[in-house]
Amino acid sequence: MKHILLITGAGKGIGRAIALEFARAARHHPDFEPVLVLSSRTAADLEKISLECRAEGALTDTITADISDMADVRRLTTHIVERYGHIDCLVNNAGVGRFGALSDLTEEDFDYTMNTNLKGTFFLTQALFALMERQHSGHIFFITSVAATKAFRHSSIYCMSKFGQRGLVETMRLYARKCNVRITDVQPGAVYTPMWGKVDDEMQALMMMPEDIAAPVVQAYLQPSRTVVEEIILRPTSGDIQDD
């Protein structure tokens, strides 16, 4: 059975790992035929991950989009509706961050972070949940962060955006439970992704890898539709990496 899955931020990091994990899952689940709709700001990244997923036997569809741009959100939504007519899974993974001391952060840092993490995530979810509500099925993942429930000194704007996402998650559950839609909040701690920039070997050794997040996401999706994994919290074994 074909499953239409949209993954935002699929070109790098956690999104890329989730796409590959879904592609590989079909080997062990004969009734699961993923159609991976992969979205990212960078076409070259999408082309690469698309080829990797196809090598695993999955069908792929790529669309370059920046979810901080409302025109791109509308285009992405229209693409799903017109090409497929339904959607089984939305992985809200696209996210950005600007970090620094409170006094150093700017209005541009604020807008850059909020436009993707909150505005884009909200309006994409709003549009595609309407489709799930009509079809009375679906699953939405929010890749938030441990920073959705815990503050970090040099992450004030990022924490605000993630606390906000957490509010959206809880609100969506109130709607989703009435129409058989599953909502899963995934809260990773430190994961070695491009968002961290250059880190030394000692710090990298303390961090999780994107694959560590991808496997539980796919496992949660493949649960029977009568069951929802509401929250997945993953941290490095050594705990959170502090920024003070």
Swiss-Prot record:
Record-level Gene Ontology MF annotations: nucleotide binding; oxidoreductase activity
Reaction equations catalysed: L-threo-7,8-dihydrobiopterin + NADP(+) = L-sepiapterin + NADPH + H(+); L-threo-tetrahydrobiopterin + 2 NADP(+) = 6-pyruvoyl-5,6,7,8-tetrahydropterin + 2 NADPH + 2 H(+)
Positions contributing to NADP(+) binding: 9-15, 40-42, 66-67, 93, 116, 158, 162, 191-196
Regulation: Slightly inhibited by N-acetyldopamine but not by N-acetylserotonin or melatonin.
Top class in the EC scheme: oxidoreductase
Residues engaged in binding substrate: 99, 145, 158, 196
InterPro entries linked to this entry: NAD(P)-bd_dom_sf, SDR_fam
Keywords linked to the UniProt accession: Cytoplasm, NADP, Nucleotide-binding, Oxidoreductase
Cellular component GO terms held in the UniProt record: cytoplasm
EC number: 1.1.1.325
pH dependence: Optimum pH is around 8.8. Activity drops sharply above and below the optimum and is absent at pH 3 and virtually so at pH 10.6.
Signal peptide: none
SMART domains, sorted: PKS_KR (SM00822)
Description of how the protein assembles with itself and partners: Homodimer.
Protein name: Sepiapterin reductase
